[in-house]
């Protein structure tokens, strides 16, 4: 948004620098084609709302898409009211009413003429809308009767042309209608009267219904293109309205280009209707009217049914304007129009004042551009993004209560006792204390502490294991001999040494047989194996040092 606002004043300043002639309506060389035609058609549609009568609204509903003629000419209706028409007169009247509604220009004059045995002028030539409405009302009330003498109708039309259009001021268009075959003398008289009308500048069209002869009506008309034959009766006459209106109408609808350049040669293309009514192409004239005294006529270079190409007059000054008229009969009559052409300078400035304002504003424009170039572009901070709300963390469900621990496995059963050589301490004297110990671990200090001093005279024996063939020995027993209070002479073989008394090496110690008589052991004691015998040769206790943790023997026990 900031960049658009910055360039806005400069853009407005640039528009002010544009030369003023570019904004003028006539500065552009070409306008859209047919713009005046659309304007005139719009005016014609508004004028159509002012018509009255029982058939006008119905006609407008049915013929809104049809051609609306805006030319300037005289239109004559010559209608058959002979007895052969009979009850079809109302259909004939509706056809006339719808055709009249297509000619909306106030410059078009109309005349209603009927014929049978004699001719009758129902509506003299007029452009008054009220008189045309009254003429339609009188036409509707007519009762058909008499013979079919078309020449009587042409005589009445020639009288109107000579009275109201002396000097061939405007073109005359005649629409002659019949419903049957003409007798021979009536046909010949009609041909003569039609030729008189052409000499007066009239164009003759014929519309034939029911029992007509095609060669008769073609001879009466200007050409086969001017003939409208209806095969399906009077009600089908309304199908010819559009085609008839486009051919009968003489008007100029638009011109290209509407604006030309001063001093340059050019051609104008004139668009309109009724160009097929020309008798000879060399009789067509394009007239350019500047004013009452300045008129230029040119011959067209090409013509078709709806347009013609004419060389335009040279224009010397900007702003000059001329109107266009066309003649199809070598200048006898011209049909007028409101189409005009205007000259312009086409962008060439003849006045130096046009440059004054741009020269004054040019420094301001340069200053504005210089400031824009020097201005530092300020980068806008990026928009602050709003922190998105973190979704609330769902509280985890409480853990399930711990399952009770599985029951402990039952303790393994104690190993079965091994029947090996146990260690047996035999008390030979009356020791007050333990008389026997099994499974002594460690050193012999414990054994000496448990023995009574009075039992020290008993020699101990060490039994060698049966499966290992080793003797229990202590390292300190080989180095020193200390006399313990309760130790007999105990010894170990020097070759069999062990740092400690293993748990799996039990033995049997019991007194020597030299000093003490063996006593019978209780029955609960285990039996001594036969290989556990012998006397220790070396004393044990004298060589063992006292352990710091060993207790002195209790002599009172």
From Swiss-Prot:
GO molecular function: metal ion binding; transmembrane signaling receptor activity
Chief subcellular location: membrane
Pfam families in the record: Anth_Ig, VWA
Matches recorded under Gene3D superfamilies: von Willebrand factor, type A domain (3.40.50.410)
Polar residues bias locations: 534-557
Segments forming domain VWFA: 74-244
Record topology, Cytoplasmic segments: 367-557
Membrane topology (Extracellular): 26-345
Membrane disposition: Single-pass type I membrane protein
Binding site for a divalent metal cation: 82, 84, 148
Membrane-spanning parts: 346-366
Keywords (A to Z) from UniProt: Membrane, Metal-binding, Signal, Transmembrane, Transmembrane helix
Protein name per its UniProtKB record: Anthrax toxin receptor-like
Species this protein is from: Macaca fascicularis (Crab-eating macaque)
Gene coding for it: ANTXRL
């Amino acid at each position: 948004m900031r960049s658009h606002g910055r360039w806005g004043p400069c853009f407005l300043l640039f528009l002010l620098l544009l030369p003023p002639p570019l904004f003028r309506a006539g500065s552009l060389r070409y306008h859209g084609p047919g713009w005046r035609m659309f304007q005139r058609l719009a005016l014609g549609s508004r004028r159509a709302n002012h018509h009255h009568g029982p058939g006008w609204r119905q006609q407008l509903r049915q013929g809104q898409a049809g051609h609306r003629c805006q030319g300037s000419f005289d239109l004559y209706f010559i209608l058959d009211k002979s007895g052969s028409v009979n009850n079809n007169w109302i259909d004939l009247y509706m056809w006339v009413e719808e055709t009249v509604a297509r000619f909306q220009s106030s410059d078009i004059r109309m005349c209603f003429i009927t014929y049978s045995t004699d001719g009758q002028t129902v509506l003299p030539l007029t452009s008054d809308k009220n008189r045309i409405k009254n003429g339609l009302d009188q036409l509707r009330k007519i009762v058909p009767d008499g013979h079919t003498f078309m020449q009587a109708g042409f005589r009445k039309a020639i009288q109107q042309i000579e009275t109201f259009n002396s000097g061939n001021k405007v073109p005359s268009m005649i629409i002659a209608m019949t419903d049957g075959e003409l007798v021979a003398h009536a046909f010949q008289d009609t041909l003569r009267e039609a030729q008189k009308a052409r000499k007066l500048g009239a164009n003759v069209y014929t519309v034939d219904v029911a029992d007509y002869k095609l060669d008769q009506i073609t001879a009466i008309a200007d050409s086969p293109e001017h003939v409208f034959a209806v095969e399906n009766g009077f009600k089908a006459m309304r199908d010819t309205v559009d085609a008839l209106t486009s051919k009968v109408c003489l008007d100029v609808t638009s011109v290209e280009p509407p604006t030309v350049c001063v001093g340059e040669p050019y051609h104008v293309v004139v668009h309109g209707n009724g160009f097929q009514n020309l008798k000879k192409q060399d009789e067509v004239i394009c007239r350019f009217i500047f004013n009452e005294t300045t008129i230029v006529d040119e011959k067209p270079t090409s013509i078709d049914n709806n347009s013609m190409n004419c060389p335009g007059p040279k224009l010397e000054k900007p702003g000059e304007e001329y109107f266009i008229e066309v003649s199809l009969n070598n200048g006898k009559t011209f049909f007028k129009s409101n189409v005009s052409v205007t000259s312009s300078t086409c962008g060439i400035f003849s006045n130096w004042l046009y440059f004054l304002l741009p020269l004054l504003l040019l420094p301001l424009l340069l200053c504005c551009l210089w400031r824009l170039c020097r201005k530092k572009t300020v980068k806008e901070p990026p928009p602050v993004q709003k922190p998105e709300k973190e979704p609330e963390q769902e509280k985890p469900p409480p853990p399930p209560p711990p399952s009770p621990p599985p029951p402990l496995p039952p303790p393994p059963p104690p190993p079965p006792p091994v029947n090996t050589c146990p260690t047996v301490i035999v008390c030979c004297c009356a020791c007050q204390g333990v008389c026997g110990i099994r499974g002594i671990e460690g050193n012999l200090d414990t054994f000496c502490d448990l023995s009574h001093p009075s039992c020290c005279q008993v020699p101990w024996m060490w039994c060698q294991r049966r499966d290992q063939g080793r003797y229990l020995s202590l390292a300190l027993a080989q180095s020193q001999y200390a006399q313990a209070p309760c130790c007999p002479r105990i010894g170990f073989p020097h070759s069999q040494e062990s740092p400690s008394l293993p748990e799996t090496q039990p033995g049997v110690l019991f007194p020597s047989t030299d000093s003490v008589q063996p006593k019978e052991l209780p029955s609960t004691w285990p039996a001594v194996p036969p290989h556990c015998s012998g006397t220790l040769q070396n004393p044990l206790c004298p060589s063992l040092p006292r352990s710091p943790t060993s207790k002195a023997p209790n002599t009172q026990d």
